[in-house]
Amino acid sequence: MRYMTVSIRDYLDDENLLCGIFETFSCSKNKDIEGFFKEKSIDFEKKHFSRTYLVIDEHRNLAGYFTLALKAMNLDKSVSNRLRKLVSGYSNKPDSAIYLIGQLGKNYANPYVKQFSGDSLINIAVDYINEAQDIVGGRAILVECENRKLLMEFYERCGFQQLSKQTGDALLTYVISLDKLH
């Protein structure tokens, strides 16, 4: 199946249309993904905190969405020198800017959901980050996820490495070098 990606920024002057698109989205597996999309993505877009992209299938259904942002990271001493170097380029540099895939959500209300894999969605998001890297540089991509076995296995299968262990209710952090993706 073919997919087209569009920015919600292209529809900001028609919030009624966006609200109609939002109504077609359901992610029962993670209500936070659905909540961000429906309640925060427009505001984050307007404030330039992030960019949200819609993935539309050839039947003009919303297949999923992803949100990209930049994040300032402080790599504490618990992060290995190898991972610190992957993120910042230097094993002794504690601060770094990193690309963030802040949201990644499939639309389970789409009748063709089984034909659209999470791997396809993350690959589309990574393609956009690669374009940004060509323009402004950058070394790595960060994702954060809940401590759920399926999520952890998904990101590890995609080549991400766990950056730090979870403490309390904090999200798990995974990174991948952009060099590894080329």
Residue spans of the language-model regions?
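Non-catalytic substrate-recognition and accessory regions of acyl/acetyltransferase enzymes
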Residues: 1-113, 120, 124-142, 146, ...
